[in-house]
Amino acid sequence: EGFVIMDKFKLVATSGTARAAEFNTQHGRVSTPVFMPVGTQATVKALSPEEIKNTGASIILGNAYHLSLQPGVKLIHDFGGLHSFMNWDKPILTDSGGFQAFSLSETNKITDDGITFKSPSDGSSHFINPEQATLNQIQIGADIIMCFDHCIEYGASLIEVEAAMDRTHRWASLCQQTFQNYGNEDRQSLFGIIQGGTSRDLRLKSLEILSALDFKGYAIGGLAVGESKSTMYELVNLCNQYLPPGKPRYLMGVGSPEDLLSLIHISEP
């Protein structure tokens, strides 16, 4: 019948704050550190599902915002879920669309209620709030669901960064309530996202507030958006020191081989 996903989280080895771990999902086991190939719109570009498996990938990433636009949540749900739709029988993590607040910032409008996006394909307007973003991911059958967050651009003022972080925290509570009401906790898990820009103080505040919400896993968001590598490495190391120790960690947006290896090893003594 599948696993209760993060009750099976296990630390295999540690060195400083660097960790090797494994966890089970209803679609199989994931060993970390792990790289997630990006399958934004239910496909990893230029590769078939079999070719992806042949690379050794054990989990892939989808984007619920893009999938909700095309082909649509209902079609994917009616097809039997995202795994069936893309012919992938291993774990899938879906991002909520919060990063598009940053990447599509010229065409969207952000309020405390949610984000109004313009579709990159036809220019139509679409409003997404934390509840809908969470429901979309539940309905398409993602193994790991990400909270809806406000990822703000690098260089924003401290006041703007703090406002985006506070909004992220409020949205995280709404995502959690929605998941508790409609999610399948035996088969899916919800991760919170740490924000706070490049401010150590704000990062520590975000860590404290979101840790208290007791998500099944945590992501470090808002990095790899233009800051220096030394700043990114410093903030990842800071977050690693304070994230709940018995839970998985997801570093969002980082994918170069150099950064992957550096950030895995930077936490070692």
Residue ranges and their predicted role:
Residues 78, 207, 232-237:
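Charged helix-capping and loop-helix junction motifs
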Residues 56-57, 141-142, 210-218, 244-246, ...:
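Glycine-enriched alpha-helix->loop->beta-strand junction motifs that scaffold or abut catalytic
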Residues 193-197, 248-258:
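Glycine-rich beta-to-alpha transition loops that act as phosphate-gripper elements at the mouths
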Residues 139-140, 167-190, 195-225:
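Alpha/beta enzyme core
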Residues 68, 149-157, 199, 216-227, ...:
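Conserved radical SAM core fold
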Residues 5-184:
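Non-catalytic, usually N-terminal nucleic-acid engagement modules in DNA/RNA processing proteins
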Residues 262-269:
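Residue-level detector of conserved catalytic or cofactor/ligand-binding positions
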Residues 125, 156-167, 198-205, 227-231, ...:
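Alpha-helix N-cap and loop-to-helix initiation/capping positions
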